[in-house]
From Swiss-Prot:
Cofactor note: Binds 1 FAD per dimer. Binds 1 AMP per subunit.
Gene behind the chain: etfB
Protein name, UniProt field: Electron transfer flavoprotein subunit beta
Keyword Electron transport carried by entry: yes
SMART domains: ETF
């Protein structure tokens, strides 16, 4: 079974982002970038499937600038066999990314595609679903457990009030939730080996995909500043402040 895993380059989750002075977006100058945490979970699940003897090849793919090769090398160090970068410096919306991934899927013909359920920079939670619609593949979103059984993959999903398990006919698309697994760290020997693994670079034009956006970002704003909280000495004082100062009771 060939497994295709999508990964995205995002601002590291430990970084406090800054908005540009003109409110056109986030200032990425000299900012640490990392693999999207949900994508790390997707890579880990693919590697575990290979360790179980279910997957025979793992292909990591990313859409983004040349610098995204860094995240692909990380995926290779974690256990992917080869990588593909769809190189684009444009600001791409979810649909454009899904179209590019669809072109890669058509070329690679994987039996299973695994993506993070969302990226922490935009929180759109759209690409996996759009890719499923474009390919016609079955989809299982918010996966907390994945089991491949013959020509099907059973996906346990976290939903409000409980769990739902669905059986998907392969080929299929799965998006990962936080509780699916705990991603491993790449060892130094594997990091060195990853440098020699194949990484192909293609362009949207070579794939025959237009990345023209139908969405325009008008403004990006930082959250409004919040006043610091205070400590009170008693319940009576708390009630007094809620009643007379906050006026919520």
């Amino acid at each position: 079974m060939k497994v295709l895993v999508a990964v995205k380059r995002v601002v590291d989750y430990n970084v406090k982002v800054r908005v540009k002075a003109d409110n056109s977006g986030v200032d990425l100058a000299n900012v640490k970038m990392s693999m999207n945490p949900f994508c790390e979970i997707a890579v880990e699940e693919a590697v575990r499937l290979k360790e179980k003897g279910v997957a025979t090849e793992i292909v990591a793919v990313s859409v983004g600038p040349t610098a995204a090769q860094e995240q692909l090398r990380t995926a290779l160090a974690l256990g992917a066999d080869r990588a593909i970068l769809v190189e684009s410096n444009d600001e791409l919306n979810s649909l454009a990314v899904a179209k590019l991934l669809k072109a890669v899927v058509d070329k690679e013909q994987p039996q299973l595609v695994i993506l993070g359920k969302q990226a922490i920079d935009s929180d759109n939670n759209q690409t996996g679903q759009m890719l499923a619609a474009l390919t016609g593949y079955a989809q299982g979103t918010f996966a907390s457990k994945v089991e491949v059984a013959g020509d099907k993959v059973n996906v346990t999903r976290e939903i409000d009030g409980g769990l739902q398990t669905v059986a998907l006919n392969l080929p299929a698309i799965v998006t990962t939730d936080l509780r699916l697994n705990e991603p491993r760290y790449a060892s130094l020997p594997n990091i060195m080996k990853a440098k020699k693994k194949p990484l192909d670079v293609v362009t949207p034009d070579a794939l025959g995909v237009s990345t023209a956006s139908t969405v325009k970002t008008l403004k990006v704003e930082a959250p409004a500043a919040r006043s610091a909280g205070i400590k009170v000495k008693s319940v009576a004082e708390l009630v007094e402040k809620l009643k007379n100062e906050a006026k919520v009771i």
